[in-house]
């Protein structure tokens, strides 16, 4: 069905007859531009579902175009019950499929048909390779999005506001236009496919101007391996996780009691006689919790005890104060001013530990666990820095975590190697 929008004419494919006609057009073409639009399968996987998570998304649209074609195709995969003929295009090694973020397209293809695409090419990685090799992005508006690509390389701005719109319902002409422009081009431009034009231009630069064919091969192969890493995720031992949180909560309560002692707050005791021998439990007073949650009042209270300047409770500030206190030496080797310095060291050290424990306990760890796989899934970038180094990030998706920060997390429990790999 032909749809004429403000910026582009497109073919919207919703019937078997229309799909068959498209397949005839595609047959024998060696180069295609392809792109998905997805939505979160909230009905099946609940509020943790995400349109960016291959395990909990639904592929709604697939846009297709080829060189010289001014009327891109938008295939409604759901209306056609996700036809296997589309899967076969992804598997066809004789057809190069150019996608902007091919890692995501590979993941969606795996989620939809259970296969990994063959001969798929990532234009974003190509864009990043040029940026890393030349420093191009350092002097221009930063970013490697599709909008940045067509703006900076082809001088064609695109409105990307509908990227996060709801693709699960009846689609509007504006949504169809948005989808079509991911593989097409505005009718008043000099292009028919912005994606393919940018691909041809940048690849020529990479291969012939900068003579970097080996770099292209390595990074284009790498993004598929990264996609597999994202798909598989990391298994979680829930027994260890529960032990971790329980231990962290117990230590947090203990540090609240320590802070209560520093500020001379009275602590109640509860005696339990049910087990025969009396069991004494110390109860964290409410007023220490209130004080610890009031930074202004806490700063004021600490300043009354310590001979140092303190105007906030940021980690760097507290660490600086701690170093200052720790570096003060008395001539006679005794503690300064009746132990005030040592008290300050204890208070600041305990406060730093309390802040770490609070973050551990308050983090919604369950949100990181995929509701379908039971694993945690990081997001990786083949080229994540200006130097070309691989990176990990949780940006843009609350269901992902930053795998680069794992080594900076101070664990609260000692995990024996054999426990780490238990099945349960």
Regions from the language model: what does each represent?
Residues 3-205, 245:
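Conserved DEDDh/DEDDy metal-dependent 3′-5′ exonuclease domain
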């Amino acid at each position: 069905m032909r749809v004429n929008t403000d910026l582009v004419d497109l073919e919207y494919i919703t019937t078997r007859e229309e799909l068959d006609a498209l397949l005839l057009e595609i047959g024998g073409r060696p180069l295609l531009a392809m792109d998905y639009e997805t939505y979160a399968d909230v009905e099946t996987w609940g509020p943790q579902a995400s349109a960016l998570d291959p395990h909990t998304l639904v592929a709604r649209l697939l846009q297709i175009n080829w060189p010289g074609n001014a009327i891109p195709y938008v295939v409604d995969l759901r209306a056609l019950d996700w036809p296997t003929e589309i899967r076969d295009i992804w598997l066809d090694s004789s057809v190069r499929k150019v996608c902007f973020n091919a890692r995501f397209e590979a993941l969606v293809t795996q989620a939809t048909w259970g296969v990994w695409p063959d001969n798929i090419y990532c234009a974003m990685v190509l864009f990043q390779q040029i940026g890393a090799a030349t420093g191009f992005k350092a002097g221009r508006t930063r970013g490697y999005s599709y909008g940045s690509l067509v703006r900076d390389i082809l001088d064609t701005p695109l409105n990307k506001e509908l990227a996060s719109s709801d693709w699960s319902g009846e689609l509007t002409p504006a949504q169809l236009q948005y989808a079509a422009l991911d593989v097409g081009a505005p009718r008043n431009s000099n292009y028919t496919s912005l994606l393919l034009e940018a691909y041809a231009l940048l690849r020529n630069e990479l291969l012939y101007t900068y003579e970097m064919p080996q770099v292209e091969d390595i990074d284009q192969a790498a993004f598929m391996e990264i996609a597999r890493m994202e798909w598989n995720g990391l298994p979680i031992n829930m027994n260890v996780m529960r032990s971790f949180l329980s231990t962290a909560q117990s230590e947090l309560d203990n540090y609240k009691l320590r802070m209560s002692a520093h500020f001379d707050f009275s602590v109640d005791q509860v005696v339990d006689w049910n087990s025969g021998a009396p069991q004494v439990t110390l109860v964290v007073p409410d007023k220490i919790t209130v004080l610890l949650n009031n930074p202004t009042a806490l700063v004021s209270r600490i300043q009354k005890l310590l001979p140092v300047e303190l105007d906030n409770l940021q980690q760097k500030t507290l660490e600086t104060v701690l170093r200052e206190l720790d570096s003060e030496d008395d001539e006679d080797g005794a503690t300064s001013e009746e132990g005030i310095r040592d008290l300050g060291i204890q208070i600041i050290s305990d406060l730093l530990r309390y802040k770490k424990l609070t973050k551990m306990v308050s983090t919604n760890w369950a949100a990181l666990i995929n509701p379908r796989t039971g694993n945690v899934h990081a997001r990786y970038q083949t080229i994540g820095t200006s130097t070309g180094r691989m990176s990990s990030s949780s940006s843009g998706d609350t269901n992902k975590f930053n795998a680069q920060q794992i080594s900076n997390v101070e664990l609260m429990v000692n995990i024996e190697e054999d426990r780490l790999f238990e099945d349960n």
